[in-house]
Amino acid sequence: FSASIGKAKSKKTFNVSAIVAAALKNSTVLRYAAELPEEKRKVLYIDTEQSPYHCLKVMKRILRMAGLPDDRDSGYLEFLALRKYTPEQRISIVEQAIYHSPDIGLVIIDGIRDMVYDINSPGESTRIISKLMQWTDDRQIHIHTILHQNKGDENARGHIGTELNNKAETVLLVEKDKGNSDISHVSAMHIRAMDFEPFAFRINDRALP
């Protein structure tokens, strides 16, 4: 599994939208190239903190970025809005969806901190990270999670952030440009495979890169 981290308003969700769009197209969006096998083309996107209205906006933007019509179901993208549930209920719903949705290749968890009550609890953090590793192994899928950075430093927030850094294959850092807040920079904070060149993006009037 992998993760994106960044401060509030750094456009982490937008960056992940590009990853999902690349997976839906099975080609390249921004600098992300995806190649999912034919029997694992489905993407499951889980949002734990936004309203259904905001989730719909994110879904439409992903479809537009993938060059797909945004007014009908693509068949390859499944969205779960879990804001109203408790952390245990969220884990249970996500587990059910991962094990009972056929053809899934990529799972996004936008808001992994909402799968625990206390981000500084070693027990809870170890449990959810172990779940991520179990799900990826059992279902042979890739999971990408999103987590905020601490306000005061570059670290991912809480004990769950420490666990993510220790266990993730890749941790992407999304940062606002210091001189122009319309621009965000993406770099690999930690990567076990081949490194990639940092890049930047800005969003146009149609909310596209």
Where are these regions (language model features)?
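Conserved RecA-like P-loop NTPase ATPase core
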Residues: V20, Y45, D110, A168, ...
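Short, flexible, glycine/charge-rich loop motifs used to bind or transfer phosphoryl groups or to couple energy/partner
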Residues: L30-L36, G67, E95-I98, Q134, ...
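Walker A/P-loop NTP-binding active-site region of P-loop NTPases
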Residues: F1-L68, V171
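Short histidine/acidic/glycine/proline-rich micro-motifs that form metal-
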Residues: S10, Q50, K84-Y85, N150-G152
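Conserved inter-motif catalytic segment of the P-loop NTP-binding fold
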Residues: P37-G123, R127
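Secondary-structure boundary/capping motif
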Residues: K12, H54-C55, Y117, D153-A156
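Phosphate-binding/switch region of NTP-binding enzymes
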Residues: A3-S4, K9, G123-L208
